[in-house]
Amino acid sequence: MNDFKLKNKWDIPSQSLPIIFIGAGGIIRNAHIPAYKKLSLNIAGVYDLNHETAKTLAKDFNISDVYNNLDDALNNKDVVFDIAVPADQLLPIVQKLPLNSYALLQKPMGSNIQEAEKILKVCRERNITAALNFQLRFSPMMLCLRDAIDKNLLGKIVDIEFHYSYYLPWHLWPFLEEIDRVEIPYNSIHLFDLIRSLFGMPEGVFAYSNTHPKYPNLSDTKTTAILKYRKDLRCALSLNHCYQFGDKNQNANLKVEGTDGVAFITLGSTV
C-alpha cells in the first residue's frame, strides 16, 4: 500500500475566463476569492445590492470594476458569473443572464423544487452552462477517496457514515431566520451531493432535522439521515451543528468502509 498514488487535484483548464461576482458576502470573501487567487484566475468585477459592500470587497482584493446595478454587471460577454445570493434571489438573476453565458450558482438551487425546475428550464432555454456550488466533491481529500474507490482499493463498499458534532456560527447569516428549511438545503447538502457523486442516486432518503434552543428563530440546525442503497450498503449521517462545549471534542468525520479496506477522512477546520 506504500507504492500507490491517489489523485488529489482537479485538472485545471487550459483556458480561463474572467470572473464577475454577483453578491459580495462572506462566501465570496472568505472562500471563493482565496481559491481563485490561488489559481491565478482573473476576477474582473463585482456587484452587490449594498454598493458599499461591493466597493469594500473591490478595494480589499484589487477588483477593477464595481457595478452600480445588476444590468451593468450582466452586460458582459465571455465571462463566468459567480452568483452568491440567497436562494429566493437566484431565479430572477438567472432569468437575466445573457444567452450562451457561464455561471456558478450558489446552493441551494432556489427556495424549493418548483424554483429549481424553473432555473433548470431557463438555463436550457438560454443555453447557459451552469453549475451548482457543490465544491466538496472536488476537494483534494474527496478526489483521493474517489480515486481509491475507482482503483478498487477498498473493495466492495458496504458502509458509509458521516458524523458531525461541532459548532457552526449560524448568527453570521441572519437571513436564514426567514427560511423554512435551513440545515440540509444551506449546509449539509454538500454531504448528500458528495455521496450521490460517489455512489449514485439512492433509492430513498429518510431524514429528520431538529432545532436547538440557542437558535430559536432557525427552522433547524441538526439532521439525522439514512440513504437507502442496496441491502448490503448502509449509509447514515448524524449531523449536529450546534455543539456547545468547546473545540476539544468537536469532530467532522467520514468513514467509507469496504470489504478490503476502509477510509477515514477528517473534514478540516470545523468553523
Model-derived features with residue positions:
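N-terminal Rossmann-like dinucleotide-binding module
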Residues: 1-61
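Contiguous beta-strand/loop segments that form the cofactor/metal-binding neighborhood of enzyme cores
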Residues: 1-5, 186, 192-270
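Aromatic/hydrophobic pocket-lining residues that form π-stacking "cages" and hydrophobic walls in ligand
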Residues: 54, 93, 119, 144-145
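Beta-loop-alpha module in the N-terminal Rossmann-like domain of NAD(P)-dependent dehydrogenases
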Residues: 61, 65-122
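Hydrophobic residues in well-ordered beta-strands that form the structural core
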Residues: 105-106, 130-132, 161, 237, ...
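Rossmann-fold dehydrogenase core element
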Residues: 118-136, 155-162
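Predominantly a Rossmann-like dinucleotide-binding segment in NAD(P)-dependent oxidoreductases
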Residues: 136-216
